[in-house]
Amino acid sequence: MSRYRGPRFKKIRRLGALPGLTSKRPRAGSDLRNQSRPGKKSQYRIRLEEKQKLRFHYGLTERQLLKYVRIARKAKGSTGQVLLQLLEMRLDNILFRLGMASTIPQARQLVNHRHILVNGRTVDIPSYRCKPRDIISARDEQKSRTLIQNYLDSSTNEELPKHLTFHTLQYKGLVNQIIDRKWVGLKINELLVVEYYSRQT
């Protein structure tokens, strides 16, 4: 299944706020209208919607998300929390959380078009897994810096998560540590996502 490129508002109206996909928010009351439909949601539907929320927020294909779930299952610790850490430490998401892009799709474009350096080297893979002490910066070119400055100017000035530091004048961010669960930028029940995939295999 390919990455979603359809109407974004349609998704947030059904699933709730997806800041990685779009800065738009569902209108007040739209969630209530969805909940007022006759019939109770099945457990499968609830798990499916949490999975879709995760997939659309981080801009993943179904295959990519399944791959991350499998990696998380093999790691030590809570599968759900490890899954969120893997997704949050992707380069495209780090750029988004730093404010260097307004959405994750915009961050992905910056990476694909070779505007971003990691530790002084160009990285053009959005899924690149960042690690503590990585330095994320814009290429020292006018075009790269202008693009990022435009995103910074339009950002909503949300509080920077504790695992990141950003130096605005240098267009440079630092990964301080692996993200803590409470700083994940999406309202999600990751256990339902893990349960969804457990029942599919």
From Swiss-Prot:
CDD domains: S4 (cd00165). The keyword S-adenosyl-L-methionine does not apply. Residues 14-43 are annotated as: Disordered. Gene3D superfamilies: Ribosomal Protein S4 Delta 41, Chain A, domain 1, RNA-binding S4 domain. Keywords: Chloroplast, Plastid, Ribonucleoprotein, Ribosomal protein, RNA-binding, rRNA-binding. It is found in: Plastid, Chloroplast. Its main location: plastid. The keyword Ribosomal protein applies. It holds the Pfam family Ribosomal_S4. Residues 89-169 form the S4 RNA-binding domain. GO terms for molecular function: rRNA binding; structural constituent of ribosome. One of its GO terms (cellular component) is small ribosomal subunit. NCBIfam families: PRK05327.1 (NF003717), rpsD_bact (TIGR01017). PANTHER family: 30S 40S RIBOSOMAL PROTEIN (PTHR11831), SMALL RIBOSOMAL SUBUNIT PROTEIN US4M (PTHR11831:SF4). Part of the 30S ribosomal subunit. Contacts protein S5. The interaction surface between S4 and S5 is involved in control of translational fidelity. Belongs to the universal ribosomal protein uS4 family. One of the primary rRNA binding proteins, it binds directly to 16S rRNA where it nucleates assembly of the body of the 30S subunit. This is Small ribosomal subunit protein uS4c. The lineage of its organism: Eukaryota, Viridiplantae, Streptophyta, Embryophyta, Tracheophyta. The gene is rps4.
